[in-house]
Each structure stands twice: as structure tokens, then as C-alpha cells.
Regions:
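Preference for long, amphipathic alpha-helical scaffolds in soluble/luminal domains
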Residues: 1-198
């Protein structure tokens, strides 16, 4: 188990790749670990914030430094280098009811890259082919965020995954299953709402 002290030790030593590997290994997000490898500092900072929040340590002295790192690493287009890392960074910045321009720019980045079918490409160019693993990762990170659901075509993403769920590979299926758990019940079951008792 990673402790606050151990996370801080790896962060201060700038061992971002190692920190990322150790943070992601026991998590469902490990299915998309390769998607985060090109941006180890941003991904490690974001996942460290998520883990510290899970440990009920959002007041740890490391947290403000991690947040400043994420804000500093945000690119001019609003993303953090790629779609998956952007989703993870947004999740981290939204913790503890986070607010700010960095979040708004990141959400706009994801909304811009979302394809008409409702999912995202692996490479951050809108005309690139859709990628189920990256899209499932995005939803696994942000499906419970009302700001995210309002910023993107969330219903289109849900419909796309529901209609193609049997064709997903194991990694994408695992992330999609996790994402479905994060979707508020009223949204997750439109069929149930239609057939509810009157």
C-alpha cells in the first residue's frame, strides 16, 4: 500500500514513471496504463491526488504542489497531451469540489475532440479513428461529474458503449463496467425511467 510519505518521496525524487506505475498497478485504470506513459509527470500528479483523496488526505502538504504542477503542465489547447491524461487530470482537479479555468479549458478540450458517434480518438486529433479503450477510460474518470456530462455529448457516449458493449476488448470492457458504476442512477437507466410506475 502506498502511503502519503512514500508518494511524496517518489514525487520529490522526480521518479514520475515509477510513481505512476505503483499508483496504477492495483487499479482498474491499469488497463489503460500505456495511454498515460507519454505524460508521466501529469499522470502521476493526477493519480497521486486521486489516491490521496481516497486515503482521506486532501490536506497533505503534497497536494497543493501536485495541483500547481497540473495547472503548469496544461497545454494551450486545454489538454494535458492526450485524451486519457486530460481525463485523469480533470478528475484530480475536480476533487474536493475543485473549480477554475484549468478545469473549464480541459472540459472544452474533451468536448472538442469528442466524435459525432460520442466517443474519443486515441490521438488528440478529432479526425482520427475512435478508440474504445481511451473513451472508456474518459468515462471511468469523469462519468460522475455533472460538469463533464454537461460539457460533452454524454448521452451519445452512453449509447455508443451500450450498443457496442459486446465488441469491446477486455481492457475497454473493464473500464466501461467501472464507468457504468460511476454514472448516477437516473442517467444510467433511461429504460427503467420510461417503464417506471406511474
Amino acid at each position: 500500500m502506498l502511503t502519503v510519505r512514500y508518494i511524496e518521496k517518489l514525487w520529490d525524487a522526480r521518479k514520475y514513471s515509477r510513481l505512476l506505475e505503483e499508483l496504477i498497478a492495483p487499479r482498474v485504470e491499469a488497463a489503460a496504463a500505456g495511454e498515460l506513459a507519454d505524460t508521466p509527470a501529469a499522470a502521476a500528479a493526477a493519480l497521486a491526488l486521486v489516491r490521496l483523496d481516497e486515503l482521506h488526505q486532501p490536506q497533505a502538504s503534497l497536494c497543493p504542489r501536485l495541483i500547481r504542477t497540473l495547472v503548469a503542465l496544461q497545454e494551450s489547447d486545454g489538454g494535458w497531451g492526450d485524451v486519457a491524461t486530460t481525463a485523469l487530470c480533470l478528475r484530480a482537479l475536480c476533487l474536493q469540489n475543485g473549480q477554475g479555468q484549468a478545469i473549464e479549458r480541459g472540459l472544452a478540450y474533451l468536448a472538442t475532440l469528442q466524435q459525432p458517434a460520442g466517443i474519443w480518438p486515441k490521438i488528440p486529433i478529432r479526425r482520427m479513428p475512435e478508440d474504445a479503450l481511451v473513451s472508456a477510460f474518459v468515462l471511468a474518470q469523469l462519468a460522475d461529474s455533472e460538469r463533464f456530462r454537461d460539457a460533452v455529448r454524454f448521452d451519445a457516449a452512453l449509447a455508443r458503449f451500450e450498443s457496442h458493449r459486446w465488441s469491446l476488448d477486455q481492457g475497454a470492457q473493464s473500464l466501461w463496467d467501472h464507468a457504468r458504476l460511476r454514472i448516477p442512477a437516473m442517467i444510467a437507466t433511461p429504460a427503467a425511467a420510461e417503464s417506471s410506475w406511474s
